[in-house]
């Protein structure tokens, strides 16, 4: 550091960290110990998947059904499968099954039990389903699910599988707990191997893991209290926090430790730490801000799962940045020169490793690319477009039990139900109809008959069922049957009517995700219903509401991310074109990542190898989630590399030289950071939750492509093709400071000295004019 330069605030921050290093470590240790027990309990208190739009028409309809008919989301479907292929649809068999399940009726939380009456598929008579209505709300049912499951009696000669919303949510919570452990078992050792290869010592390699684990545990512990206060937090949150916290926490620590090790070569521990905070610490702050853009944008979509990802992502990134600028520097200050302790290899091999690092590998690649920029650009873009192509045929849907693999009882039971019954009836559109009088009053019968007759004539309707079906279309027949107490009791038992409320099931001609089914839901909601007040809900309506919520704000999300990213890069690079190029390249890596996800999860290519049970669709929320996360991380790598190129360009005025030196300075570190992020995030590919598998695969592919093919090949090629135009901006807007000092520590410019190996780049061969 120059003697005449003024220390920056971050330099002084590093000095203070060094002087208070023991107190800072003890404070973090105390915080970790306090929050760890709550972090471990977080998955067990999350009761919702976060898909349900608050106050949506479908949610209002469900509430009306629960109030008026006692139809609650807290229910179970018990799928009974005969071991001897006995016909369980026969009356005697169904009577026997209900008798064997009769002990359930004595339980205080069981409201009713009855056989499902939906249309059946041929050849599956050995499978039947029993609906168990619970006298509990959804949260209480989930908390008592294991007790409920334990009280289900066995059926002689048959196997029983419990599914339904409550069972699926319970299994999802179990999957979250096991997935976190599995991902850590896979990801942390893999990250440690990469860190050992980068640093060469066990001491240095362990520090980023400590920072990552502390960031995750602290974040999850803090979010435990938020989840207690807000019951809508998604049960995907712990997986997301673990994935992102380990990835960015270890990546940020990699930058800090790398710079500190290099500075220790020629400085004492205090000065080395101060310079590390002023350079690498600044880069980590800027990187954290870049990643926060995408997470902030998620909050614009009014769905609990997006809000949960947004809160979790923002919190864990902020904590990771804080840990990287407080805990980690304090640990480094305590270690000092002992950071080089416990080497992995003998000294002679370590020296050879240094020679390889200084061999100019990345510089040579850059110069080769810039010698053939057109050919390489065309080849790389063609390859990426080929990976992006499957996105054109992407079919999005909202999963339910499909988020779990078939080894889970709730998923397997759901698959059996789909086999045995008409899927369209199981996922029918449900209309809660408020009648003008009691359901057996002629006015109510007349009004509901007019409504159902009109619905039957609508395009896309296969069948309409209601309590009027007992009269086969005749008002007189309906009145005749309703005069019998046993018929009324049976209708009320099956939750078809009660007082002034009736339920109408509209079975669509097509699947629940078909465009005509979606239009049918919209038509039902806008049609005139004289004498009735109708609320349209059911699975197709519920999923349509989710899609509408996303589409309502997607333009705002994209616009916010692009606009804020452009402004930040415009300020950082003082260039009009470079931010546009960065966004274009981010979209290429993002599109390629989504393309691979479509190949695997929709088309089934490689699905068996990855343990994916593909359904021919993609989780509808996935493209937005991947976009928001990848865009921030890719911008992080872009800033890391282009800032170093800019520093060399402003010093030399030579675009080609600056590009080669920039890649040489940052290529190894960007690749290492990307590999660490990829193995941590990629570990979730081998977990049970299909949504997290897809997110893990998409992020891994996108980040690896961004840090390798795009940063190593496409960036140098475009830098060469655009030449000095890369650096153009109006003088009145952002004047460029040419011939700036290389002492980046003492400037206010955005720098990525933290992303370098600590070596100053060599001067170019030609002479440069002295700075005025």
Region locations from a protein language model:
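Membrane-embedded transmembrane helical bundles of large multi-pass transporters/channels
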Residues: 1-45, 110, 136-396, 529, ...
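Structured non-transmembrane domains adjacent to transmembrane bundles in polytopic membrane proteins
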Residues: 54-75, 82-166, 393-607, 617, ...
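Short hinge/gating elements
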Residues: 46-49, 401
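Short coil/turn segments at secondary-structure boundaries
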Residues: 30, 78-79, 381-382, 429-432
């Amino acid at each position: 550091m120059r003697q005449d330069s003024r220390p920056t605030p971050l330099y002084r921050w590093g000095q203070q960290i060094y002087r208070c290093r023991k107190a800072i470590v003890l404070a973090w240790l105390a915080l970790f110990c306090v929050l760890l027990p709550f972090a471990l309990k977080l998955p067990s208190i999350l009761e919702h998947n976060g898909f349900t739009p608050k106050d949506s028409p479908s949610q209002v309809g469900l509430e009306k059904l629960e109030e008026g008919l006692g139809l609650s989301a807290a229910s179970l479907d018990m799928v009974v499968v005969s071991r001897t292929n006995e016909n369980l649809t026969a009356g005697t068999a169904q009577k026997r099954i209900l008798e064997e399940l009769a002990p359930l009726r004595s339980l205080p939380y069981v409201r009713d039990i009855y056989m499902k009456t939906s249309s059946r598929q041929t050849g599956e008579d050995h499978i039947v389903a029993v609906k168990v209505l619970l006298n509990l709300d959804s949260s209480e049912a989930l908390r008592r699910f294991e007790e409920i499951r334990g009280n289900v009696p066995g059926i002689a000669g048959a196997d029983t599988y419990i599914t339904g919303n409550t069972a699926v949510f319970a299994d999802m919570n179990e999957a979250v707990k096991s997935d976190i452990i599995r991902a850590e078992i896979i990801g942390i050792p893999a990250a440690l191997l990469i860190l050992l290869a980068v640093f060469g010592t066990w001491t240095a390699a362990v520090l980023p893991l400590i920072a990552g684990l502390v960031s995750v545990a602290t974040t999850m512990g803090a979010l435990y209290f938020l989840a207690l206060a807000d019951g809508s937090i998604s049960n995907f949150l712990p997986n997301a926090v673990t994935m992102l916290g380990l990835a960015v926490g270890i990546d940020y620590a990699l930058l800090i430790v790398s710079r500190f090790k290099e500075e220790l070569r020629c400085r004492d521990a205090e000065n080395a730490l101060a310079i590390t905070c002023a350079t690498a610490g600044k880069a980590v702050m800027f990187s954290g801000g870049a990643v926060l853009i995408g997470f902030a944008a998620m909050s614009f979509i009014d769905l609990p799962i997006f809000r949960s990802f947004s809160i979790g992502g923002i919190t864990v990134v902020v904590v990771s940045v804080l840990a990287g600028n407080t805990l980690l520097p304090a640990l480094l200050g305590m270690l000092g020169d002992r950071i080089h302790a416990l080497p992995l290899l003998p000294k002679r091999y370590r020296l050879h490793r240094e020679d390889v690092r200084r061999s100019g590998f990345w510089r040579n690649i850059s110069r080769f690319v810039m010698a053939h920029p057109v050919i390489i650009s065309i080849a790389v873009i063609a390859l990426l477009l080929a990976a992006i192509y499957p996105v054109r045929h992407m079919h999005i849907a909202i999963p339910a039990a499909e988020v779990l693999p078939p080894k889970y009882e709730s998923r397997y039971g759901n698959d059996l139900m789909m086999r045995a019954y008409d899927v369209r009836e199981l996922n029918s559109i449900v209309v809660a109809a408020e009648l003008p009088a009691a359901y057996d009053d002629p006015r109510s019968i007349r009004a509901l008959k007019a409504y159902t007759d009109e619905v039957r004539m609508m395009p896309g309707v296969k069948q309409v069922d209601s309590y009027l079906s007992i009269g086969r279309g005749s008002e007189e027949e309906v009145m005749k049957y309703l005069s019998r107490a046993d018929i009324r009791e049976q209708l009320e038992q099956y939750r078809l009517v009660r007082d002034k409320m009736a339920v109408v099931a509209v079975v669509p001609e097509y699947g629940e995700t078909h465009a005509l089914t979606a239009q049918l839901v919209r038509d039902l909601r806008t049609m005139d219903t004289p004498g009735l007040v109708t609320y349209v809900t059911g699975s197709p309506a519920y999923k349509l509401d989710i899609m509408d919520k996303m589409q309502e704000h997607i333009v705002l999300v994209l616009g916010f991310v692009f606009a804020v990213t452009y402004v930040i890069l415009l300020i950082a690079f003082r260039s009009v074109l470079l931010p546009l190029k960065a966004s274009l390249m981010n979209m290429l890596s993002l599109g390629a990542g989504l393309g691979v996800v479509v190949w695997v999860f929709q088309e089934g290519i490689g699905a068996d190898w990855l343990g994916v049970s593909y359904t021919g669709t993609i989780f509808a929320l996935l493209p937005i989630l991947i976009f928001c996360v990848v865009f921030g991380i890719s911008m992080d790598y872009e800033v890391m590399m282009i800032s170093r190129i800019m520093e060399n360009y402003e010093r030399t005025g030579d675009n080609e030289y600056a590009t080669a030196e920039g890649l040489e300075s940052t290529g190894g570190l960007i690749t290492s950071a990307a590999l660490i992020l990829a193995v941590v995030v990629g570990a979730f590919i081998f977990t049970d939750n299909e949504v997290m598998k897809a997110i893990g695969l998409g992020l891994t592919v996108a980040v690896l492509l961004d840090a390798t093919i795009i940063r190593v090949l496409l960036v140098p090629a475009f830098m060469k093709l655009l030449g000095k135009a890369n650096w153009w901006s109006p003088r009145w807007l952002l004047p460029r400071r040419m011939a700036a000092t290389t002492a980046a520590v003492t400037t206010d410019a955005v720098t990525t000295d933290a992303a370098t190996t600590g070596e100053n780049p060599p001067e170019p061969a030609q002479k440069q004019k002295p700075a005025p």
